[in-house]
Amino acid sequence: MTQSLADMRRDYTRDGLSEAQAPAEPFALFHQWFADAVKTEQPPVEANAMTVATVDTDGRPHCRILLLKGLDEQGFTFFTNYESAKGQQLAARPFAAMTFFWPTLERQVRIEGRVVKVTPQESDAYYQVRPLGSRLGAWASPQSRVIADRDELQELLKATEARFSDSQPDCPEHWGGYRLLPERIEFWQGRPSRLHDRLNYRLQGQEWVRERLAP
């Protein structure tokens, strides 16, 4: 069955974004928008879900949904297997882009910048507050590698459970966090007739420059 996509659209009428509402630096505005999303968005939407895009050595982009697990004035933190496809891509090309979309609020935030590993202490601190199943999974799963079937994954998990039957698992060396150090952050607010509000912050030296972009 062929479905027409031409008429699939919604009009955005909830709110606007003016320079008067926007602080001089982007972190305060992100904190405000993120708090709004946590209060407003309902399941299945996760306020901290984001698309993270990386690039491989051939220049081909790859993207996936991850969860934001840390935010401070340094940047935006997420965790993964360092030996995964994204980990290998970041090792070769340490730059990434993130996109948050909060449909109820009709808002989007795009973030671009350089990516660095967090300290082992930061990785361990987050690892230790994860559910036990997730901690075991970080050891069991050879992320991004080809496996025969689901049964193989279950066997790997059983072996990991047996390995740590008498002790708590430590954070694996191949697992940990990345922090995106933003060089550009764009705030997008949906508006009627596709004439959206776009406020862009770009890092120039040590200062943030704020500018409006045409929709």
UniProtKB/Swiss-Prot annotation:
<dbReference type="GO" id="GO:0008615">
    <property type="term" value="P:pyridoxine biosynthetic process"/>
</dbReference>
<feature type="binding site">
    <location>
        <begin position="9"/>
        <end position="12"/>
    </location>
    <ligand>
        <name>substrate</name>
    </ligand>
</feature>
<keyword id="KW-0664">Pyridoxine biosynthesis</keyword>
<feature type="binding site">
    <location>
        <position position="69"/>
    </location>
    <ligand>
        <name>substrate</name>
    </ligand>
</feature>
<comment type="pathway">
    <text>Cofactor metabolism; pyridoxal 5'-phosphate salvage; pyridoxal 5'-phosphate from pyridoxine 5'-phosphate: step 1/1.</text>
</comment>
<dbReference type="InterPro" id="IPR019740">
    <property type="entry name" value="Pyridox_Oxase_CS"/>
</dbReference>
<feature type="binding site">
    <location>
        <position position="126"/>
    </location>
    <ligand>
        <name>substrate</name>
    </ligand>
</feature>
<feature type="binding site">
    <location>
        <begin position="194"/>
        <end position="196"/>
    </location>
    <ligand>
        <name>substrate</name>
    </ligand>
</feature>
<dbReference type="Pfam" id="PF01243">
    <property type="entry name" value="PNPOx_N"/>
</dbReference>
<comment type="function">
    <text>Catalyzes the oxidation of either pyridoxine 5'-phosphate (PNP) or pyridoxamine 5'-phosphate (PMP) into pyridoxal 5'-phosphate (PLP).</text>
</comment>
<keyword id="KW-0560">Oxidoreductase</keyword>
<dbReference type="InterPro" id="IPR011576">
    <property type="entry name" value="Pyridox_Oxase_N"/>
</dbReference>
<dbReference type="GO" id="GO:0004733">
    <property type="term" value="F:pyridoxamine phosphate oxidase activity"/>
</dbReference>
<feature type="binding site">
    <location>
        <position position="134"/>
    </location>
    <ligand>
        <name>substrate</name>
    </ligand>
</feature>
<feature type="binding site">
    <location>
        <position position="130"/>
    </location>
    <ligand>
        <name>substrate</name>
    </ligand>
</feature>
<keyword id="KW-0285">Flavoprotein</keyword>
<dbReference type="InterPro" id="IPR012349">
    <property type="entry name" value="Split_barrel_FMN-bd"/>
</dbReference>
<feature type="binding site">
    <location>
        <begin position="143"/>
        <end position="144"/>
    </location>
    <ligand>
        <name>FMN</name>
    </ligand>
</feature>
<keyword id="KW-0288">FMN</keyword>
<comment type="similarity">
    <text>Belongs to the pyridoxamine 5'-phosphate oxidase family.</text>
</comment>
<dbReference type="InterPro" id="IPR000659">
    <property type="entry name" value="Pyridox_Oxase"/>
</dbReference>
<feature type="binding site">
    <location>
        <position position="108"/>
    </location>
    <ligand>
        <name>FMN</name>
    </ligand>
</feature>
<feature type="binding site">
    <location>
        <begin position="79"/>
        <end position="80"/>
    </location>
    <ligand>
        <name>FMN</name>
    </ligand>
</feature>
<dbReference type="InterPro" id="IPR019576">
    <property type="entry name" value="Pyridoxamine_oxidase_dimer_C"/>
</dbReference>
<dbReference type="GO" id="GO:0010181">
    <property type="term" value="F:FMN binding"/>
</dbReference>
<feature type="binding site">
    <location>
        <position position="86"/>
    </location>
    <ligand>
        <name>FMN</name>
    </ligand>
</feature>
<dbReference type="Pfam" id="PF10590">
    <property type="entry name" value="PNP_phzG_C"/>
</dbReference>
<feature type="binding site">
    <location>
        <begin position="64"/>
        <end position="69"/>
    </location>
    <ligand>
        <name>FMN</name>
    </ligand>
</feature>
<feature type="binding site">
    <location>
        <position position="188"/>
    </location>
    <ligand>
        <name>FMN</name>
    </ligand>
</feature>
<protein>
    <recommendedName>
        <fullName>Pyridoxine/pyridoxamine 5'-phosphate oxidase</fullName>
        <ecNumber>1.4.3.5</ecNumber>
    </recommendedName>
</protein>
<comment type="subunit">
    <text>Homodimer.</text>
</comment>
<comment type="pathway">
    <text>Cofactor metabolism; pyridoxal 5'-phosphate salvage; pyridoxal 5'-phosphate from pyridoxamine 5'-phosphate: step 1/1.</text>
</comment>
<feature type="binding site">
    <location>
        <position position="198"/>
    </location>
    <ligand>
        <name>FMN</name>
    </ligand>
</feature>
